[in-house]
């Protein structure tokens, strides 16, 4: 925690062990994600309909410690309504289906993200998005007004190997800013 001079976000599974780590680290926020041992990366959002009551207790404990809690969810309205019930501060929309969509489905998946963003904002939560976003697909998502945070890691790090971290971040930021101002390329 001493190293991070900006906002620190911890992505974590909804386990007692991770809760202890979060309480010890005191990040500014946590994003609760599903964790399946067989996955290399998160392949979907939390299923809050089947979430145990202990998840609500975990959210309350983290909030009491001053940690903002975000739920990582697929763009499914049923799960978004559940996030409001758990009193999440924010929802991160899982954009994997959009990122992996072929040309025939990409507009449909983008509409799902837009509709989810509107519903999340309407319920009073902050809207974040991420998963599979890269330099060629980020602008339509960045243009969604309700989204206040994008989480992009792999694409930036991969580009940084070739161009350097500063240039990779600068290029991604430029794409996102252009999309916000209606100047998407």
Cite the ranges covered by each PLM segment.
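Short beta-strand/loop segments at the ligand-binding rim of alpha/beta enzyme cores
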Residues: 1-10, 58-71, 120-130
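C-terminal helical cap(s) of enzyme catalytic domains, especially alpha/beta-barrels
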Residues: 44, 105-106, 159-182
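Histidine/lysine/aspartate-rich catalytic loop segments that bind and position anionic ligands
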Residues: 68-123
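Glycine-rich phosphate-binding active-site loops on the catalytic face of alpha/beta enzymes
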Residues: 32-39, 89-102, 145-165
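Glycine/small-residue-rich loop that forms an oxyanion/phosphate-binding "nest" at active or ligand-binding sites
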Residues: 1-51
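Hydrophobic faces of well-ordered beta-strands that scaffold small-molecule active sites
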Residues: 8-12, 30-32, 69-71, 91-93, ...
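Glycine-enriched alpha-helix->loop->beta-strand junction motifs that scaffold or abut catalytic
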Residues: 3-6, 25-30, 64, 85-91, ...
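Catalytic cores of alpha/beta
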Residues: 16-25, 76-86, 129, 133-147
């Amino acid at each position: 925690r001493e190293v991070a001079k900006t906002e620190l976000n911890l992505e974590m599974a909804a386990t007692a062990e991770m809760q202890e780590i979060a309480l010890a680290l005191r990040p500014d926020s946590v994003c609760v994600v599903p964790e399946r041992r067989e996955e290399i990366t998160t392949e979907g959002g939390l299923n809050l309909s089947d979430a145990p009551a202990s998840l609500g207790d975990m959210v309350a404990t983290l909030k009491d410690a001053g940690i903002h809690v975000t739920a990582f969810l697929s763009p499914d309205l049923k799960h978004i309504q559940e996030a409001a019930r758990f009193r999440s501060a924010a929802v991160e929309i899982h954009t994997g289906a959009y990122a992996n969509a072929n040309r025939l489905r990409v507009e449909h998946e983008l509409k799902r993200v837009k509709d989810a963003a509107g519903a999340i904002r309407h319920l009073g939560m902050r809207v974040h998005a991420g998963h599979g976003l890269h330099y060629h697909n980020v602008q339509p998502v960045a243009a969604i007004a309700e989204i206040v945070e994008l989480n992009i890691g792999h694409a930036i790090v991969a580009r940084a190997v070739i161009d350097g971290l500063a240039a990779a971040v600068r290029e991604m930021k430029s794409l996102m800013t252009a999309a916000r101002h209606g100047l998407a390329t």
